[in-house]
């Protein structure tokens, strides 16, 4: 069986994530530049089995022109059009992230629901019952089946009413940094497995909770100096400078949040010890 080649149009910040996972799987991947003309995308796609696109970066009319040339596109244009018809609501101070991947043979995987606040993400979202979590995830699975999704997406919904959709992210979920450090299988690997129609991986947490927080650089310092104190204080902290995140896995959520908040405050210069 020939090794497949995939074309990808996505945000710059996630291209390297997809490339790393493709390399691990031994899959060829061509990173197509954002803003390319329809003609150039068609030309670059000639040696690809299919292309994966972020629908937020290229118009549906352009995608249809590309598809008419014989290029296979994931997610399917029909799925993109179905999602585009959904009503969006204003963002809120607390939101839920529900992430799903689906293969052409309808195998589906979801991660635990993530709580999104202004500065911290928690997976799984605390203070929601198992019954509510199941209801939310089932509604997402049903939507993925209804639109015949191939690939993956993130639904960001109001934490007070999950029926209020706030945003849809295709290749760059808000919660993907959490899954990268704390899930058996991260989003980018799972997305590739989905579009390749490979069996999907385990999406469970490695620990009871994953907590990640946003980092802000101290205007009087740099992004390197804080490592000396923070890594010595807690060697379990994970840093991601590409996304400006700090993360932690564990079973004691209260202690984890204390550590994340301390890291945020020290990193930005709010505290000095």
Predicted feature residues:
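Glycine/small-residue-rich loop that forms an oxyanion/phosphate-binding "nest" at active or ligand-binding sites
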Residues: 62-83, 89, 122, 130
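A short beta-strand motif that forms the metal-chelation/ATP-contact edge
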Residues: 98, 161-172
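Internal nucleotide-binding/catalytic subdomain
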Residues: 86-152, 159-161
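Short beta->alpha transition motifs characteristic of CBS
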Residues: 112-117, 167-174
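ATP-binding N-terminal substructure of ATP-dependent carboxylate-amine bond-forming enzymes
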Residues: 1-77
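Active-site "cap" helix and flanking loop/linker of ATP-utilizing ligase/carboxylase catalytic domains
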Residues: 51, 135-154, 169-217
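Solvent-exposed alpha-helices and their adjacent loops that cap or buttress functional pockets
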Residues: 1, 43-44, 89-93, 102-106, ...
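Peripheral (often C-terminal) accessory segments that flank ATP-dependent C-N-forming ligase machineries
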Residues: 193-273
């Amino acid at each position: 069986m020939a090794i497949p080649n995939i074309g990808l149009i996505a945000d710059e910040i996630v291209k390297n994530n997809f490339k790393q996972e493709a390399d691990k799987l031994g899959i060829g991947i061509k990173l197509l530049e954002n803003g390319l003309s329809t003609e150039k995308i068609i030309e670059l796609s000639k040696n690809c089995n299919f292309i994966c696109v972020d629908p937020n970066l290229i118009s549906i009319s352009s995608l249809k022109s590309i598809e008419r040339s014989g290029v296979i596109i994931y997610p399917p244009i029909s799925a993109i059009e179905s999602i585009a018809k959904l009503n969006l609501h204003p963002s809120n101070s607390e939101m839920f992230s529900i992430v799903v991947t689906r293969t052409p043979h309808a195998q589906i995987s979801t991660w635990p629901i993530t709580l999104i606040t202004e500065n911290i993400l928690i997976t799984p979202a605390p203070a929601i019952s198992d019954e509510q979590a199941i209801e939310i995830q089932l509604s997402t699975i049903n939507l993925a089946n209804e639109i015949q999704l191939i690939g993956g997406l993130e639904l960001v919904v109001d934490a007070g009413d999950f029926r209020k959709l706030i945003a849809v992210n295709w290749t760059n979920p808000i919660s993907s940094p959490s899954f990268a450090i704390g899930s058996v299988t991260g989003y980018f690997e799972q997305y590739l497995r989905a579009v390749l129609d490979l069996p999907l991986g385990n999406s469970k947490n490695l620990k009871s909770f994953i907590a990640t927080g946003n980092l802000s650089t101290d205007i009087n310092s740099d992004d390197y100096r804080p490592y000396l104190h923070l890594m010595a204080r807690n060697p379990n902290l994970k840093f991601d400078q590409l996304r400006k995140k700090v993360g932690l896995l564990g079973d004691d959520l209260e202690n984890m949040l204390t550590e994340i908040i301390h890291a945020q405050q020290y990193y930005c210069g709010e505290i000095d010890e």
